[in-house]
Amino acid sequence: MFQQLNCTNISSLLFLVSLLGIFLNQKNILVMLMSLEMMFLSISFNLIFSSIRLDDIIGQIFSLLILTVAAAESSIGLAILVIYYRIRSTITVELMNLMKG
């Protein structure tokens, strides 16, 4: 019981740290992307430990699906970020509204 509460607290702490990273660092898009990935990781962490506690495999499968989608989202986001850096030579968020498309 104590171990389950401890894992839930760790997952909640990871989620809150990633929210704090997004809200405090709104100028660097790379840090915001890393904080978003940490959010996905904390949600997956919570799903895995909840499914272990409930002795259900569905949470673990869903967690694997979340991690797969997060990896694809991360690679697409980094590719867009590299192209944006080559064009503007900066990765600040202030100039993002100048993008055409």
From Swiss-Prot:
InterPro entries: NADH_UbQ_OxRdtase_chain4L/K, NUOK/Mnh_C1-like. One of its GO terms (biological process) is ATP synthesis coupled electron transport. The chain crosses the membrane at residues 5-25, 29-49, 64-84. GO terms for molecular function: NADH dehydrogenase (ubiquinone) activity. Pfam families: Oxidored_q2. It comes from Chondrus crispus. The gene is ND4L. It catalyses: a ubiquinone + NADH + 5 H(+)(in) = a ubiquinol + NAD(+) + 4 H(+)(out). It is found in: Mitochondrion membrane. It is a multi-pass membrane protein. Its EC number is 7.1.1.2. The keyword Nucleotide-binding does not apply. Belongs to the complex I subunit 4L family. GO terms for cellular component: mitochondrial membrane; NADH dehydrogenase complex. Keywords: Electron transport, Membrane, Mitochondrion, NAD, Respiratory chain, Translocase, Transmembrane, Transmembrane helix, Transport, Ubiquinone. This is NADH-ubiquinone oxidoreductase chain 4L. Core subunit of the mitochondrial membrane respiratory chain NADH dehydrogenase (Complex I) that is believed to belong to the minimal assembly required for catalysis. Complex I functions in the transfer of electrons from NADH to the respiratory chain. The immediate electron acceptor for the enzyme is believed to be ubiquinone. Its main location: mitochondrion.
